[in-house]
Amino acid sequence: MKGFFITGTDTDVGKTFVTACMLRTLVDKRIRATAYKPVQSGAQWREGKWIAPDVDVYRKVIDVTDEDGCTYLLQTPCSPHLAAKIDGVTIEPDHIVAHVHQLQQTYDFVLVEGAGGIAVPLVDDSFLIAHLAQLLHFPLIIVARASVGTINHTVLTVEYAKAFGLQIAGIIMNGFSTPKNEIEQENIRMIEEMTHVPVIGEIPHMTNFSHQQIVWRKEWWQ
C-alpha cells in the first residue's frame, strides 16, 4: 500500500494545505486516495458538535467524515499529549495504526498528516510523532517555511528523522515571495547542501486559500 507521512518543521507551516493539494492531485489522477489526521487538537464547535478543522480542509477535496479522517479529536489547542490529558483521553498508538490499516482496505493511497513537528509528544515523552511514523512505514514529506530561520529548523528536523531511521522523500517549502528573493533562494540551496534531501516543492505565500486554490500547480514541483 502507498502513502506519505506529512510532517513539518513547526506548527502552522502549511502541512494541511500541502496535504490537501497532494490529495487533490491524486484524486484528479483517478487514484483512490484519502487524507488522515491521527490526532487533532484545537477542535472547533460548530452546529452543535466538535469539528476537526484539518479534516474540514480535506473535505474541500473529498467526502470524508471526522470519524474516518481523525482518530482522536481533542478540544484544547496545544500539544496532543497535553490536550489528551485535559480531555481525559488516552491516546493508543495501536488504535491509530489499526485505523490506517482500515483505510488501506478502501483506498490505494493514504496521506497521514502529523501534529506539529516530528518531535511532538503524543503520549508524554514515551511516544512521539517520530515513533508513529516508524510504525506506519510511510516515507516522510517535510513541510518547511521559506523565511529566515528555516535552515536551522529544517536541518534539525531532517537529522532528527534520520536518527529514527525514517525515509525522507523530500522537503516542501512554503510561503515564498513572488518572485523568490535572494534570501529564500539561498535557504533552498543551503538546506539541500546540508541535508542531502531534495526540496521537491516551492509554494508561494498565500494569505488564505479557497476551494479553487487547493490544487498542486505544476510550477511548484522542483
From Swiss-Prot:
The reaction(s) this protein catalyses: (7R,8S)-7,8-diammoniononanoate + CO2 + ATP = (4R,5S)-dethiobiotin + ADP + phosphate + 3 H(+)
GO BP term, pick one: biotin biosynthetic process
Cofactor: Mg(2+)
Keywords: ATP-binding, Biotin biosynthesis, Cytoplasm, Ligase, Magnesium, Metal-binding, Nucleotide-binding
Presence of keyword Transcription: no
Pathways per UniProt: Cofactor biosynthesis; biotin biosynthesis; biotin from 7,8-diaminononanoate: step 1/2
GO molecular function, one term: ATP binding
List of residues binding ATP: 12-17, 54, 113-116
Leader sequence segment: none
Record EC number: 6.3.3.3
GO cellular component terms, semicolon-separated: cytosol
The name this protein goes by in its record: ATP-dependent dethiobiotin synthetase BioD
Organism: Anoxybacillus flavithermus (strain DSM 21510 / WK1)
The encoding gene: bioD
